[in-house]
């Protein structure tokens, strides 16, 4: 249990450090960013498919955005401030395809994070996931947009 807490603390620290400054042009205005790290290799998880869904009034999940992580393990540009309105969102990270591409048979099909967004006004959300073949850990950093 203590090692799990330490792992979560390290993941949160990694996300915090990565949020210290923008990593590219125009990314500071990105209201939703996903970062995926490979705990086995100690590196960014590259080319991981990410799907984002928004909960509809009838409680079903509607596709909202999708993409793949970059060489830095990050996915920016999923949405705009205008499109990312108040609501319940689900980020689904395709862990199975990632591990299969590396020749590893994983336990999980995907990792998912369901969260309420912008219920207290506009915010910036960074969802981070630390992956291994038989476990995953997620954390989020939520900040106010800079004026």
From Swiss-Prot:
Superkingdom in the source lineage: Eukaryota
Which sequence positions carry the modification called Sulfocysteine? 30
Glycans attached where?
A: 118
UniProt xrefs under CDD domains = TLP_Transthyretin
Which tissues is this protein detected in according to the database? Detected in liver.
Residues with the Phosphoserine modification: 72
Which PANTHER family does the UniProt entry name for this protein?
A: TRANSTHYRETIN (PTHR10395:SF12), URICASE AND TRANSTHYRETIN-RELATED (PTHR10395)
Quaternary structure annotation from Swiss-Prot or TrEMBL? Homotetramer. Dimer of dimers. In the homotetramer, subunits assemble around a central channel that can accommodate two ligand molecules. Interacts with RBP4.
What is this protein called in UniProt? Transthyretin
Q: Which organism is it from?
A: Pongo abelii
């Amino acid at each position: 249990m203590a090692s799990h807490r330490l792992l979560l603390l390290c993941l949160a620290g990694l996300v915090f450090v990565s949020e210290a400054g923008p990593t590219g042009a125009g990314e500071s205005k990105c209201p939703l960013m996903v970062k995926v790290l490979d705990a086995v290799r100690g590196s960014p998880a590259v080319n991981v498919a990410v799907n984002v869904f928004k909960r509809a009034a009838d409680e079903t999940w509607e596709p909202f955005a999708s993409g793949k992580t970059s060489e830095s393990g990050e996915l920016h540009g999923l949405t705009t401030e205008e499109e990312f309105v108040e609501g319940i969102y689900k980020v689904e990270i395709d862990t199975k395809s990632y591990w299969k591409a590396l020749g590893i048979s994983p336990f999980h099909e995907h990792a998912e994070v369901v969260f309420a967004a912008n219920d207290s006004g506009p915010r910036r959300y960074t969802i981070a996931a630390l992956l291994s073949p038989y476990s995953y850990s997620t954390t989020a950093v939520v900040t106010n947009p800079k004026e």
